[in-house]
Amino acid sequence: MTMYTTMTTLTLTPLILPILTTLINPNKKNSYPHYVKSIIASTFIISLFPTTMFMCLDQEAIISNWHWATTQTTQLSLSFKLDYFSMTFIPVALFVTWAIMEFSLWYMNSDPNINQFFKYLLIFLITMLILVTANNLFQLFIGWEGVGIMSFLLISWWYARTDANTAAIQAILYNRIGDIGFILALAWFLLHSNSWDPQQMVLLSTNPSLTPLLGFLLAAAGKSAQLGLHPWLPSAMEGPTPVSALLHSSTMVVAGVFLLIRFHPLAENNPLIQTLTLCLGAITTLFAAICALTQNDIKKIVAFSTSSQLGLMMVTIGINQPHLAFLHICTHAFFKAMLFMCSGSIIHNLNNEQDIRKMGGLLKTMPLTSTSLIIGSLALAGMPFLTGFYSKDLIIETANMSYMNAWALSITLIATSLTSAYSTRMILLTLMGQPRFPTLTNINENNPTLLNPIKRLTIGSLFAGFFITNNILPMSTSQMTIPLYLKLTALSVTFLGLLTALDLNYLTNKLKMKSPPYTFYFSNMLGFYPNIMHRSIPYLGLLTSQNLPLLLLDLTWLEKLLPKTISQYQVSASITTSTQKGMIKLYFLSFLFPLILTLLLIM
């Protein structure tokens, strides 16, 4: 056991060295990115030893080294939990980050601040590992906030672009809403359990109140971009492609799902929270799949596929299967990072063109990238014996076996079919047919720093699911016999989506352009949610705030009370004074008229 904990500590410690190097010697040399990449590669190799030991021993461990603070009731300490989740996730995250770092050497080669970029990526990874290995809520909150602030810095990396700055602010604001739920849960457990250690929380709060569980659900919805708090996820595509790959594969977006997995024992006996999680995940996975169907930006299609898969993970937690959700996190990381890297390769070679309508015919000019993109898309769709199949098929089988909401199961199956459809659409428009990009475009994919990481992730997308499911034993499995038609449900809807997309492509490639229906606009404009939330509601608020000062300040004070009131007093005084007509002479003359008339009559 000592060897096991020592090896794990040895895995995490070298990651801090590149950051310490920048503190000692701020003038980093050109070799710094290669140094960071080598550190992560060696750390991944070291991490395989404690993971292998965990597979053999199947024994959890907790490392508590340093006490931060002690109050009368609570003791905070630096504590790492080495269990099934953390020991499986660490090598997966390191492997994916290693590939992304090497890809960044090619993609960010001309960036003047590439050293700072690699430092940010490394801190991003470290904060995620802190979150995964934390054994108390406060330490987990440090990692939680760490991935949030690093996502802000990385999304706004190209800070001269207004869209990048807006997307970064949007990401941090939506995550702030989730953080409110997390802090609420922190406060509740401190007051009622007097502890932030998961073991004591589970023992002392076997059936906690609805308040902290709703807080955790809100936190997960914000961080993992569930429906209502989802707009920041496609907007985050304004950052560099390596950032998108790391953000969507093994760091920030899975942090919310991981939070629910880690504290699932608190919620497993609460049917209301389970139902809310299930329905939220089901609606999210369908909505994201519908939006991905009509997107034309290649990175946004992959981003919405991430949102759809996160919804599927929430569905899995909602049917009381956190280990299956974690398995999908691990398998999803490989092909999602690869899809983003293939997209980045295509975008870079086509002079920053992201519109799939202006691509086509890349299968011959970029064979390795195209092959990897096809493998990643098929793995995403859940094609048999690719990495995504081992988790996705199992999730739908388990959903079929469980006593769950049939409505949620139905829309999850529809979303699975749509996943296959938009993956096929992306392949057809990007790789097949005639080239639709300028003829003078210089396409070159011969750089080994581009090809090697894509090759490694392609191998992971082919075999990682088989390796993980056969070597890392699940904690609890329910062996049940189900009919053949239920067993083949996931495969059937996947092939249905594939065939539908192929058929539509064959039927519509020679049709004249018509005005698209309203359903197209709903999908293409993301259900009008950004327009309503980011345009209409702020406009109404601005209009109201504009009218109030105009009516209260300008109209009331500056017009009604002062000028018009003074004018009214002046009119009253004028009326009073104007009753005296100034005709005294005429009045005196009128006295003379009777006298003159009398004299005339007498005479």
Swiss-Prot record:
- Tell me its EC number(s), please: 7.1.1.2
Q: How does it sit in the membrane?
A: Multi-pass membrane protein
List the Pfam families hit by this protein, alphabetically: NADH5_C, Proton_antipo_M, Proton_antipo_N
Q: Which UniProt keyword terms apply here?
A: Electron transport, Membrane, Mitochondrion, Mitochondrion inner membrane, NAD, Respiratory chain, Translocase, Transmembrane, Transmembrane helix, Transport, Ubiquinone
Top-level enzyme category: translocase
Q: Which InterPro entries match?
A: NADH_DH_su5_C, NADHpl_OxRdtase_5_subgr, ND/Mrp_TM, NU5C-like, Proton_antipo_N
Q: Which domain of life is it from?
A: Eukaryota
A GO biological process this protein is involved in?
mitochondrial respiratory chain complex I assembly
Coiled-coil regions listed: none
Q: Which GO terms describe its cellular component?
A: mitochondrial inner membrane; respiratory chain complex I
**Predominant place of localization:** mitochondrion
Q: List the Gene Ontology MF annotations in alphabetical order.
A: NADH dehydrogenase (ubiquinone) activity
Transmembrane ranges?
4-24, 38-58, 87-107, 122-142, 144-160, 171-191, 211-233, 241-261, 272-292, 301-320, 325-347, 370-390, 407-429, 457-477, 482-502, 583-603
Reactions catalysed according to its record: a ubiquinone + NADH + 5 H(+)(in) = a ubiquinol + NAD(+) + 4 H(+)(out)
Query: Where is this gene product found?
Result: Mitochondrion inner membrane
Task: State the family named in the UniProt similarity comment for this chain.
Answer: Belongs to the complex I subunit 5 family.
Give the matching PANTHER family.
NADH-UBIQUINONE OXIDOREDUCTASE CHAIN 5 (PTHR42829:SF2)
Question: How does the record describe its quaternary structure?
Answer: Core subunit of respiratory chain NADH dehydrogenase (Complex I) which is composed of 45 different subunits.
Q: Function of this protein?
A: Core subunit of the mitochondrial membrane respiratory chain NADH dehydrogenase (Complex I) which catalyzes electron transfer from NADH through the respiratory chain, using ubiquinone as an electron acceptor. Essential for the catalytic activity and assembly of complex I.
By what name is this protein known? NADH-ubiquinone oxidoreductase chain 5
Name of the coding gene: MT-ND5
